[in-house]
């Protein structure tokens, strides 16, 4: 469905400054940190592996702050791209752009400011990291528009969410070795899987509005496809562990992560909206388990 088929986005109501700041906070998902955590864990995986343990503190700060800034910017540009669609979807109709509490122009300014602050932080790192930030910006800004043209926006999200991995290796080592790309591939598979849970929540609305997703592409084979994605993710992480020479702590972390993923399938086995969303949220613990495995393995060397 084209945006001409949608009703106009409401005019912004009169708000006090505290109310307006609250709407900006909602716009950047400050009230929902799950997205930042899903972006943070693979970034920390990369930094710890690149440094062989605790990375330089300034580098850790830049990437941790950058995770929040870029994820927030990604949420803003996503809502801007979907401002015609969100008022018609139950889960998104209360977003600030959908209600008109924040205008499209305001949202673009928020996006620009967030990305400029993130870029300013990156400028304190080496030239390779700065150069890699440019395709990272393109990935973050273009992702929201993919759902109109392909059933694979979740794959693209994985590419965008994982770009901190090659950047992290570049910042610590001054290069991006094969290990970084193996980890990046694992993250793409992971993000595609967990965002498919998320897409399963919106599948009926997306079908009605003409949006595309892996949940729609997989159809009744969605749980099988999810199993394949998670299996490939763990296969890639096995290669990461072997190449990095990680110890038993890492393999224990992977084992715990696998059990957590199995529980996600139990939760979402009936494909209901609420359980699918819980399965999506549950991936925070998967990322944490893998990080603890990496950090413990490196600390015990």
From Swiss-Prot:
The chain crosses the membrane at residues 34-54, 57-77, 108-128, 163-183, 222-242, 248-268, 280-300. The keyword Cell membrane applies. InterPro entries: HB_polyprenyltransferase-like, Prenyltransferase, UbiA_prenyltransferase, UbiA_prenylTrfase_CS, UbiA_sf. It is found in: Cell inner membrane. The gene is ubiA. One of its GO terms (cellular component) is plasma membrane. NCBIfam families: ubiA_proteo. GO terms for biological process: ubiquinone biosynthetic process. Pathway: Cofactor biosynthesis; ubiquinone biosynthesis. Its EC number is 2.5.1.39. HAMAP family: UbiA. Its cofactor is Mg(2+). Keywords: Cell inner membrane, Cell membrane, Magnesium, Membrane, Transferase, Transmembrane, Transmembrane helix, Ubiquinone biosynthesis. This is 4-hydroxybenzoate octaprenyltransferase. PANTHER family: 4-HYDROXYBENZOATE POLYPRENYLTRANSFERASE, MITOCHONDRIAL, PRENYLTRANSFERASES. Catalyzes the prenylation of para-hydroxybenzoate (PHB) with an all-trans polyprenyl group. Mediates the second step in the final reaction sequence of ubiquinone-8 (UQ-8) biosynthesis, which is the condensation of the polyisoprenoid side chain with PHB, generating the first membrane-bound Q intermediate 3-octaprenyl-4-hydroxybenzoate. It is a multi-pass membrane protein. It holds the Pfam family UbiA. Belongs to the UbiA prenyltransferase family. It catalyses: all-trans-octaprenyl diphosphate + 4-hydroxybenzoate = 4-hydroxy-3-(all-trans-octaprenyl)benzoate + diphosphate. GO terms for molecular function: 4-hydroxybenzoate polyprenyltransferase activity.
């Amino acid at each position: 469905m084209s945006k001409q088929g949608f009703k106009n986005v409401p005019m912004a109501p009169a708000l006090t400054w505290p109310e307006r700041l609250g709407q900006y906070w909602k716009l950047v998902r400050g009230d929902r940190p799950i997205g930042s955590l899903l972006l943070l864990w693979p970034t920390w995986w990369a930094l710890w592996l690149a440094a062989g343990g605790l990375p330089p503190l300034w580098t850790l700060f830049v990437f941790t702050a950058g995770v929040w800034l870029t994820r927030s910017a990604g949420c803003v540009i996503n809502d801007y791209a979907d401002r015609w669609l969100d008022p018609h979807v139950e889960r998104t109709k209360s977003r600030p752009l959908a209600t008109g509490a924040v205008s499209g122009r305001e949202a673009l300014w928020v996006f620009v400011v967030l990305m400029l602050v993130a870029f300013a932080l990156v400028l304190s790192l080496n030239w390779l990291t700065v150069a890699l930030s440019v395709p990272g910006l393109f990935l973050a800004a273009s992702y929201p528009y993919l759902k109109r043209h392909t059933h694979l926006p979740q794959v693209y999200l994985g590419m965008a969410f994982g770009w901190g991995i090659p950047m992290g290796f570049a910042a610590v080592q001054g290069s991006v070795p094969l290990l970084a790309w193996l980890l990046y591939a694992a993250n793409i598979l992971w993000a595609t899987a967990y965002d498919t849970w998320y897409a399963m929540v919106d599948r009926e609305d997306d079908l009605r509005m003409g949006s595309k997703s892996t949940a729609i592409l997989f159809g009744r084979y969605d749980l099988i496809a999810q199993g394949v994605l998670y299996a490939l993710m763990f296969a890639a992480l096995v290669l990461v562990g072997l190449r990095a020479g990680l110890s038993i702590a890492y393999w224990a972390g992977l084992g715990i992560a696998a059990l957590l993923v199995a529980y996600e399938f139990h939760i979402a086995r009936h494909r209901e909206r609420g359980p699918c969303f819980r399965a999506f949220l549950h991936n925070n613990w998967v990322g944490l388990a893998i990080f603890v495995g990496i950090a413990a393995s490196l600390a015990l060397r």
